[in-house]
Structure formats: C-alpha cells, structure tokens
C-alpha cells in the first residue's frame, strides 16, 4: 500500500517515455520555447558572441580557427534548444504519469475500502493506547519538525522535488514564495485543529501540549 503509488509511477514513467517523446517530436515540427526560454538562450548566444569578439580582438587567430569557434557556438545553441525541448517532453510525461497514477490510486482506495478501514481502525487503536504525554510530545515534535524555525530548508527541498516530479523547470522565485507561505498556512490550520478538535476530545492533552510548548 505504501510503495504502490511509487511502483505505478515508475512503471508508467518508463512505459510512456518513448511514446510521449515520439508524439512530441512528430507533432511539433518547430521547437516550442516560452518567452523566458527564448530570452535565456538569446542571452547565452550574445554572451558567447561577445566572448568570441573579445578573443578575436585580443588574439590574432587565423580564419579557420574563428570558423571553428563559430561552429562551436552554433553547436552549443543547438544543444541548449534540444535541452529545452526535452524539458517540455519531461513536463508532459510527468504530468500525464501523475494524473494516471492518481486515478489508479483513487480507484484502488475505493475498491480496497475494507483494507483501508482495517488500517484506520488499527491506527486509531494504537493512538488511543498512547498516553497524553506521548501524544503531546509527538505533536510538538512533528510541528517543530514541519513548521519550526529550522524547517524552511526542508520545505525548500521537498517543494523542489515535487516541482521537479511534475516536470516543471525549477523556478527559485516560485519555490521561495511557497516556502514562505505554505508553512504559515499549515501552522494556522494546525492551531485551529488543536483549538476545535483536541480541546473537545482531550482537554488534558491540550493542557500538556501548551505546557510543553511554553
């Protein structure tokens, strides 16, 4: 049950890779680039041209050597464009894989409802048998680990992994924005849950949690 989504994702990723690559290269005769990608490649091209011009001004190379350098710049541009094209293929591949895996996992959770009920009852019994002190300590440890002052780097790694898993190109600004807002939202939801649910179900647990938190 735990490794089932990962296995399905891996199988579909390998199975769909060749099909998605062939479909993209067949249906798109021209390379598709976003404005940001075009600007990035153009800036790289200008940078290489300026380096070539500077090198040509400083050193007196024969024409054959300059021609070789220009061919090298052309090959580098082709490599960058191919790399961007592969990024689009990976985006479609990962997005399709995740959607299919979600549908399969959702169907499995519905069809295997009996097994999930058994697992849920076992977890509830296990948590019920724990003392309030252990529960409060576990909650405090989990909250400090997930939304404490030392957790932003962990959130950054996790969000970057999810971002990459869906096939999107890494964007530091978006990741930084999610890291600065998502833990705050999660902290607010958790405090509301403590106030509404735990205060009604187990007031002693809330008292112990507040004492340990202070």
Swiss-Prot record:
Domain of life (superkingdom): Eukaryota
Membrane topology: Multi-pass membrane protein
GO molecular function: antiporter activity; proton transmembrane transporter activity
A biological process from GO: potassium ion transport
InterPro entries: CemA
Segments crossing the lipid bilayer: 92-112, 174-194
Keyword annotations of the record: Antiport, Chloroplast, Hydrogen ion transport, Ion transport, Membrane, Plastid, Plastid inner membrane, Potassium, Potassium transport, Transmembrane, Transmembrane helix, Transport
Catalyzed reaction equations: K(+)(in) + H(+)(out) = K(+)(out) + H(+)(in)
Keyword Chloroplast appears in the UniProt entry: yes
GO cellular component, one term: chloroplast inner membrane
Major subcellular site: plastid
HAMAP family: CemA_PxcA
Family: Belongs to the CemA family.
Protein's UniProt name: Potassium/proton antiporter CemA
Taxonomic classification: Eukaryota, Viridiplantae, Streptophyta, Embryophyta, Tracheophyta
